[in-house]
Amino acid sequence: MQEAAKISHKENFRLIDLSYSVKDTFLEDVAKGLSAKKKYLLPKYFYDLKGSQLFDQICETNEYYPTRTEESILRLAIKDILKCSGDITDIIELGSGSSTKTKILLKNYLRKFKVIRYYPIDVSQILITTSNRLKKEFPRLNIITIISEYLEALKYIKKNVKEPKLFVFLGSSIGNYEKKGIHSLLRSLSSAMSKNDMMLIGMDMKKDQNVLEAAYNDKKGITAKFNLNMLQHINDELEGNFDLKKFIHHSFFNEKESRIEMHLVSEQDQSVRINGFRKLFKLRKGESIHTENSFKFTEKIIKELFNASGLKEKKKWMDNKKYFSLRMVTKK
């Protein structure tokens, strides 16, 4: 796709919008998901403003270990990561989010180098707000914010950003895809990488089922609010008429697929209307809408995925419990 959508410049800040009409895409994705035999919604639509705030609250719960564990690994390994990445000064981050962990990277890279170019990529317009905050916190940082789906952004990066560069994919966000999707995205990343590029990727490891399920069913019910908020997001943006009181949050570990699944279960027979569609979307009592996966990795699976994607692990860092891993990989 052409970079024709929107480009704006400020001092040390550039915005590149490669997205199609966000509302049209949202509408198409929702209609497709609710029309499927097994209903689903895409997890990228969790993150409106309220959803992003709720996710930040989830990260503060006692049960949700991934964020604090990855952050602790990052703090302990940062000198090693800097050494490993050599003279790289271009950092491309997929799914920047609130950039809390990213700040650890940026702060330390800016201590080592006078100039750093940072390319955060996300489909959400909230990324613009996050980028502006980073610009205030790190005035020397050159920020090129890319509003886009990952695949389009990777094409842009491959064409416009010279090697060497560091791709960053934290939070085990790669695990939100189906296994085939994980493989496909890793292959796309590998294709976007040059021989001197590197990628720092966070991967959540398979562990005790009770620990996993507690992380996605916190006692305060914040994860439930986060899950239900996707329906509110549809109501707000697409003029849907979901009644959130008629759904309950349900998440569990699917051993066969090695993943946590999050669902919204209909508590009664009901019909939902989305503005722009004459069709009513019907749900039976007990029927669920699958909203998210969170794949949990093993060393064997990681090795297979990297090999099949043309990637090679250079180094890894883990916490003492081996709950989570950070891995530096290169192209084969």
Predicted segments, located by residue:
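Conserved beta-strand signature within the Rossmann-like core of class I S-adenosyl-L-methionine
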Residues: 192-206
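Substrate-binding/catalytic lobe of Class I Rossmann-like enzymes that use SAM or dcSAM, i.e.
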Residues: 213-295, 299, 303-309
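A short glycine-rich, Lys/Arg-flanked "PGG" loop and its adjoining helix->strand segment in the class I
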Residues: 183-195
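Class I SAM-dependent methyltransferase SAM/SAH-binding core
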Residues: 106-152
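Conserved class I S-adenosyl-L-methionine
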Residues: 88-97
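Class I SAM-dependent methyltransferase Rossmann-like catalytic core
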Residues: 38-85
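N-terminal auxiliary segments of SAM/dcSAM-dependent transferases
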Residues: 1-44, 52
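Core SAM-dependent methyltransferase catalytic element
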Residues: 264-267, 318-332
